[in-house]
């Protein structure tokens, strides 16, 4: 069975990642319609990837009876609206992370999913990388007691990687975008900001940037952190907001039965600068073993995701191993798993309920920063 896909949003993540990946997964998916706020961009993608229908009307995609799965690849502020509409139309939904930017908006999505025959799959691709699900989780499981963990993501400008990806992205001409689009975008964003920072009558630009950062780069790291460390953060001990760099210290309960009731600390550090380097990793420390996973830019297909293990061997010597579970990229693995979920009923790991835990963590971070009373 091949699933018919309708795509809403033909920007960077569509052109560089999802359209090529879906095309190569032609035994699982067939793209039958694509929508973008810029009709010429949608038409370009339709021509390049042999998609029958191009439109500027997202609801034409959502209500098309031939569409099995709606991909929502728009900017964050439209995620909730289109996801809910697609669920109301009975569609399965693949929504790129973040699910949305506020807890109330996430609850609206959850309510819509509960009354729909459709299901929602949230696009946290790092959690589907074979080296994460294979070597990393296997090696971490052999650590008797986790003592500390570190989450780091220092990213250079996306354009550096996109321009060398061989995908030749086309960007919209401003004159092709309706004048009302910016007003609608601002309206949706302001509503989400009010929900994300309840009781605060003065949502500053710094608060808005923090919210957008956690929804973009931060959501990758913090979602991965939650799965790797086996649960929900116990507490947020401190945060630093210094745009465009952000950091935090979390406390986690020990996942080990032998250390029940004990806790350990996790540091999170992330930011975006102009250095063309992508340093994203998660490292977990035990008393005699360290395990880390290193991610590279997802915009260049097939860059290896490696696991590094440092330990003391039976001779008392330092031993270092590097493991690569597969060269298969995380997006291919993710969409292969999504097919199993939608067609064969497999449980969705990156579900709406799971994504809500990220938003709850952001809420706790906002409170620690003094942004919510």
Regions from the PLM with identified roles:
Residues 123-130, 161-233:
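Mid-domain beta-loop-alpha active-site segment that forms a flexible
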Residues 49-112:
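Beta-loop-alpha module in the N-terminal Rossmann-like domain of NAD(P)-dependent dehydrogenases
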Residues 69-71, 118, 253-259, 337-373:
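C-terminal helix-rich "cap/oligomerization" subdomain common to oxidoreductases
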Residues 95-96, 120-122, 293:
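Hydrophobic residues in well-ordered beta-strands that form the structural core
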Residues 148, 196-197, 201-299, 325-346, ...:
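Contiguous beta-strand/loop segments that form the cofactor/metal-binding neighborhood of enzyme cores
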């Amino acid at each position: 069975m091949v699933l018919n896909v309708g795509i809403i949003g033909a920007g960077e993540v569509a052109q560089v990642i999802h359209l090529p990946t879906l095309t190569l997964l032609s035994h699982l998916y067939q793209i039958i319609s694509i929508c973008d706020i810029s009709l010429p961009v949608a038409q370009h993608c339709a021509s390049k990837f042999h998609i029958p229908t191009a439109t500027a009307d997202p609801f034409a995609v959502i209500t098309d009876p031939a569409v099995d799965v709606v991909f929502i690849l728009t900017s964050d502020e439209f995620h909730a609206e289109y996801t809910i509409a697609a669920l109301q139309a009975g569609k399965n939904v693949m929504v790129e992370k973040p699910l949305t930017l506020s807890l109330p908006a996430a609850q609206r999505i959850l309510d819509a999913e509960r009354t729909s025959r459709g299901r929602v799959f949230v696009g946290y691709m790092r959690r589907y990388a074979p080296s994460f699900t294979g070597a990393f989780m296997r090696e971490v499981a052999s650590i008797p007691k986790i003592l500390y963990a570190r989450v780091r993501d220092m990213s250079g400008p996306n354009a550096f990687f996109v321009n060398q990806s061989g995908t030749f992205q086309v960007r919209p001409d401003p004159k092709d975008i309706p004048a009302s689009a910016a007003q609608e975008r601002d309206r949706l964003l302001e509503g989400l900001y009010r929900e994300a920072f309840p009781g605060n009558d003065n949502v500053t630009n710094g608060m808005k940037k923090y919210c957008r950062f956690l929804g973009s780069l931060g959501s990758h790291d913090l979602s991965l952190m939650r799965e790797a460390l086996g649960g929900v953060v116990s507490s947020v001990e401190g945060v630093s907001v210094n745009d465009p760099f952000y950091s935090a210290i979390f406390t986690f309960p020990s996942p080990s039965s032998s250390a029940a009731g004990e806790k350990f600390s996790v540091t999170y550090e992330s930011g975006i600068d102009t250095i063309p380097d992508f340093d994203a990793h998660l490292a977990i420390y035990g008393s005699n073993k360290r395990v880390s996973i290193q991610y590279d830019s997802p915009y260049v297909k097939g860059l290896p995701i490696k696991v590094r293990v440092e330990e003391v061997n039976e001779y008392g010597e330092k031993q270092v191993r590097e493991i690569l579970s597969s060269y298969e990229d995380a997006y291919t693995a993710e969409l292969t798993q999504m097919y199993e979920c939608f067609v064969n009923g497999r449980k969705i790991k990156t579900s709406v309920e799971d994504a809500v835990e990220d938003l709850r963590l952001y809420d706790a971070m906002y409170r620690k920063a003094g942004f919510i009373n």
